[in-house]
């Protein structure tokens, strides 16, 4: 979704990851992802170099036997579990690509570790007028 000309809503999540020093990022796309893929390829703002990790995009494998797209975030994660397992990362951040927000994921990770949590969900109260 374009915002202010050349920006996309996903830029906020990716910028948050860059600013939090996250090096390996996977983007799970759905149908009609051509424009998004072009944007991701042409943008060098995030500095996800292959030497440090990289930016990976995944589209669901639609076949004659499996004719459905991702059925939500959990399904996207499940269909790409091998990538997660092979990444050898101790923690995973799952962020929506359609939110406009600024967040330091390091603070969330510190909280997550301190609480010895299996998972941590971050939410925000939004006033009705907003």
Across the structure, where does each feature detected by a protein language model lie?
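Unchanged
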Residues: 1-130
